[in-house]
Amino acid sequence: MKQLYGVIGNPIGHSLSPVMHNDAFEHLNMDAHYHAFLVKEEVLGEAVRGLKALGISGFNVTTPHKVAIMDYLDEIDPLAKQIGAVNTVVHKDGKLIGYNTDGIGFVRALQSISNEPLQEKRILLLGAGGASRAIYFSLADVGVKEIDVANRTVDKAKELIAACTATVHSVALSLEKATKEQGNYDIIIQTTTIGMHPRVEHTPLQISSLKKGTIVSDIIYNPFETKILCEAKEQGAIIQNGIDMFVYQGALAFEMWTGCVPNIERMKQLVIRKLGG
């Protein structure tokens, strides 16, 4: 019997997840299908109960449901609970179990381009929203000890740091102070929507004085190279856009559902082609 998987969100027509997962199923000769479900906020509970009743094997959760979905699940993974958001649900033994693969997916993506363990790195996070929170907690979870957070509103950065129970040395900074201190970091991670199409001329931080070998990663993938990445490249930095995070979080969800590890490079090249790269 064909296994059913999917993604719920609103809007959902733009999602690249069905193409990525269905190609992986086909490549691994698995009898499964991944479908995009448009689910409005007011019917989220009914939709989740319906998916469970249909016997869906697992599904992803995207905007605007990542927080609200938690009220309708049977169990929530401790890391997802700490992050306060779920983007992957596994249907196992009659229970819907929520996980967050956004942060862990990002960490795996970052590890793929780092020559040294992340635990030894001093990291600067730009932004203190939902994506930053997932990445901060996931970096802390793998043992990173130095993570500073820069945000337009410094109090929001302080709140994010205070919410983490792991032993992490963190300082909340203004974006202005972070700009001056950028040369102190091994890795800079841009987690805001600043620089996303169509406002491509914007950047949260002017890159001007990086240390040699700095990694600059941006979770945005439209455009492929944001202003901050272009500036970082000119400074000789190793750069990474948001495609890697998208692919790695999806691959981790796929692994959780099926027990099979998909071909990451195949997934990545497919997504790049679909985005017109």
From Swiss-Prot:
Keyword Nucleus assigned:
no
Q: Which UniProt keywords apply?
A: Amino-acid biosynthesis, Aromatic amino acid biosynthesis, NADP, Oxidoreductase
Pathway in which the depicted protein is active = Metabolic intermediate biosynthesis; chorismate biosynthesis; chorismate from D-erythrose 4-phosphate and phosphoenolpyruvate: step 4/7
Q: Which residues bind NADP(+)?
A: 127-131, 151-156, 219, 242
Task: Give the quaternary structure.
Answer: Homodimer.
Q: Which family does it belong to?
A: Belongs to the shikimate dehydrogenase family.
**So what does this one do?**
Involved in the biosynthesis of the chorismate, which leads to the biosynthesis of aromatic amino acids. Catalyzes the reversible NADPH linked reduction of 3-dehydroshikimate (DHSA) to yield shikimate (SA).
The protein's name is Shikimate dehydrogenase (NADP(+))
Q: Which organism is this entry from?
A: Bacillus cereus (strain ZK / E33L)
Gene that this sequence comes from? aroE
